Amino acid sequence: MAISREKKTELINKYARHEGDTGSVEVQVAVLTEDINELNEHLRVHKKDFHSQRGLMKKIGHRRNLLAYLRKEDVNRYRDLIQSLGLRR
């Protein structure tokens, strides 16, 4: 259920702020969003997988906290990120 190494590398390259950047808020949110989307697809098929459902809720909470931090620090970066990821905010 975890995203593939190639997909993760692609996301890191797309959202990195500089060369070698793997930990910026944008990269973390992009990777979490991809993870969340894959877990959503998994849970559509496996409705009673409550362990994965709890993991999904933890990832959503982590992404929410990162987005709140980014919104507080730099609104323009926040708006660009949610627009590029297609998040409803």
From Swiss-Prot:
The keyword rRNA-binding applies. GO terms for molecular function: rRNA binding; structural constituent of ribosome. One of its GO terms (cellular component) is cytosolic small ribosomal subunit. Keywords: Ribonucleoprotein, Ribosomal protein, RNA-binding, rRNA-binding. CDD domains: Ribosomal_S15p_S13e. GO terms for biological process: translation. Pfam families: Ribosomal_S15 (PF00312). InterPro entries: Ribosomal_uS15 (IPR000589), Ribosomal_uS15_bac-type (IPR005290), uS15_NS1_RNA-bd_sf (IPR009068). The keyword Signal does not apply. Part of the 30S ribosomal subunit. Forms a bridge to the 50S subunit in the 70S ribosome, contacting the 23S rRNA. One of the primary rRNA binding proteins, it binds directly to 16S rRNA where it helps nucleate assembly of the platform of the 30S subunit by binding and bridging several RNA helices of the 16S rRNA. Forms an intersubunit bridge (bridge B4) with the 23S rRNA of the 50S subunit in the ribosome. HAMAP family: Ribosomal_uS15_B (MF_01343_B). Belongs to the universal ribosomal protein uS15 family. This is Small ribosomal subunit protein uS15. It comes from Lactiplantibacillus plantarum (strain ATCC BAA-793 / NCIMB 8826 / WCFS1) (Lactobacillus plantarum). The gene is rpsO.
